[in-house]
């Protein structure tokens, strides 16, 4: 950097190359604002204003970095894809309305960079169009019944309510959030909880969205709500391989054969030190690799 010192007004301090892409496009296990120490070092060395970037999703984290003097500017990329109104929400005291990036890197890095396709976002389905859809309301009464209170069901229910539909969401469990909330119990996946938490907060502000928890979506109940539209958002279940006897053992009490969902449910029962223990993982996809890493 010393060769450019006299020509530079501001340093944008980042890191990572293709060989260390988990640092170039921050993996979700890296803490918020983790790169700020780099900006601080460059600032102290060259005495020039510095910008820091990297998983800065929380306004408090950004404020602390600036207050400590680690950096003079905060740079955000994925956070503004997830919520283009991030800065405005902070300025006007609406931090609780921020739709935080969960650092999944699927729609932005995977889809846009990896596949050279239009950008997408797991938590912001309107990333390419904005939220103009809210301006066009339904022109006649419309009842919408959404079955399932995971993130897909919450998104469908909120969207329907925001355009003026009377909306009913039915969830058989005591809590909303679905698989995203469950998976966030894995330590390196805890950031996923931000999305269902945001959706639950968004739903709570809609007076025409009625939520039934601990409720089964029976035909009688659905019919009684007089639906014009029914949305099936009941989620997915793990696919089991064709192994003889597997269905008799998997997820049963007293056995050590579990789907990933049951493994997460039992997460506090496993010893912290697994040295000497043998674990067989059937399936080498993303879920299998996550289990192996855990």
Language-model segment annotations:
Residues 25-31, 134-142, 182-194, 266-271:
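Short, contiguous acidic/charged loop-to-helix segments that flank catalytic cores in large enzymes
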Residues 179-227:
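N-terminal Rossmann-like dinucleotide/flavin-binding domain of flavoprotein oxidoreductases
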């Amino acid at each position: 950097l010393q060769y450019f010192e006299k020509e530079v007004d501001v340093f944008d301090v980042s890191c990572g190359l293709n060989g260390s892409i988990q640092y170039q496009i921050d993996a979700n296990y890296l803490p918020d604002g983790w790169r700020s120490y780099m900006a601080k070092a460059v600032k102290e060395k060259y005495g020039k204003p510095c910008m820091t970037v990297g998983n800065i999703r929380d306004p408090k984290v950004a404020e602390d970095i600036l207050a400590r003097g680690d950096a003079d500017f905060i740079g955000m990329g994925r956070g503004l894809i997830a919520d283009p109104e991030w800065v405005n929400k902070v300025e006007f005291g609406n931090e609780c309305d921020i739709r935080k990036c969960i650092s999944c890197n699927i729609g932005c890095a995977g889809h846009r960079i990896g596949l050279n396709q239009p950008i997408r976002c797991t938590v912001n389905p309107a990333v390419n169009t904005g939220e103009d859809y809210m301006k066009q309301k339904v022109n006649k009464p419309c009842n919408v019944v959404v079955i399932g209170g995971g993130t897909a069901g919450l998104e469908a229910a909120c969207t329907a309510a925001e355009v003026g539909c009377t909306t009913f969401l039915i969830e058989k469990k005591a809590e909303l959030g679905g698989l995203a909330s469950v998976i966030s119990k894995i330590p390196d996946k805890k950031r996923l909880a931000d999305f269902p938490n945001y959706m639950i907060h968004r739903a709570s502000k809609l007076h025409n969205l009625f939520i039934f928890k601990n409720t089964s979506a029976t035909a009688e109940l659905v019919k009684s709500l007089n639906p014009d539209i029914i949305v099936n958002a009941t989620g997915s279940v793990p696919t089991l391989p064709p192994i003889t006897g597997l269905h008799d053992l998997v997820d049963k009490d007293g056995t050590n054969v579990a789907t990933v969902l049951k493994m997460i449910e039992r997460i506090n029962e496993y010893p912290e030190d697994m040295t000497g223990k043998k674990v067989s993982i059937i399936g080498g996809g993303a879920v299998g690799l996550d289990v192996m890493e855990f």
